[in-house]
Amino acid sequence: MSHISADDVRKVAQLARLDLPDDSIATFTPQLERILDFVAQLEAIDTEGLPPTTRAVEVVNVTREDGVEPTPVREELLNQAPQREGDFFRVPRILNN
């Protein structure tokens, strides 16, 4: 069994950029120990000779056929904009220089 200290939990929280209150340390310490014990079990499994896999079940993408669909006339779209400038939508500036 792994031994995790309160300082270890604080360090992991800091590395993960989590604001972990001190009263939560006691809750997360045994949980982190169990996670590390499980990882140790996984590391002990002999995978020599097994082909690498990325998922347990092979997945096939199901996509629709591409097709041409009618689109609104550009002028109709531009006329619906709150503001426009010529053939462009005018939007508020969000970045300075």
From Swiss-Prot:
SUPFAM superfamilies: Glu-tRNAGln amidotransferase C subunit. The keyword Protein biosynthesis applies. It comes from the Bacteria. It is an enzyme of class 6 (ligase). Gene3D superfamilies: Glu-tRNAGln amidotransferase C subunit, N-terminal domain. It holds the Pfam family GatC. It catalyses: L-glutamyl-tRNA(Gln) + L-glutamine + ATP + H2O = L-glutaminyl-tRNA(Gln) + L-glutamate + ADP + phosphate + H(+); L-aspartyl-tRNA(Asn) + L-glutamine + ATP + H2O = L-asparaginyl-tRNA(Asn) + L-glutamate + ADP + phosphate + 2 H(+). Keywords: ATP-binding, Ligase, Nucleotide-binding, Protein biosynthesis. InterPro entries: Asp/Glu-ADT_sf_sub_c (IPR036113), GatC (IPR003837). One of its GO terms (molecular function) is glutaminyl-tRNA synthase (glutamine-hydrolyzing) activity. Its EC number is 6.3.5.-. GO terms for biological process: glutaminyl-tRNAGln biosynthesis via transamidation; regulation of translational fidelity; translation. Belongs to the GatC family. Allows the formation of correctly charged Asn-tRNA(Asn) or Gln-tRNA(Gln) through the transamidation of misacylated Asp-tRNA(Asn) or Glu-tRNA(Gln) in organisms which lack either or both of asparaginyl-tRNA or glutaminyl-tRNA synthetases. The reaction takes place in the presence of glutamine and ATP through an activated phospho-Asp-tRNA(Asn) or phospho-Glu-tRNA(Gln). Heterotrimer of A, B and C subunits. PANTHER family: GLUTAMYL-TRNA(GLN) AMIDOTRANSFERASE SUBUNIT C, MITOCHONDRIAL. This is Aspartyl/glutamyl-tRNA(Asn/Gln) amidotransferase subunit C. It comes from Synechococcus sp. (strain RCC307).
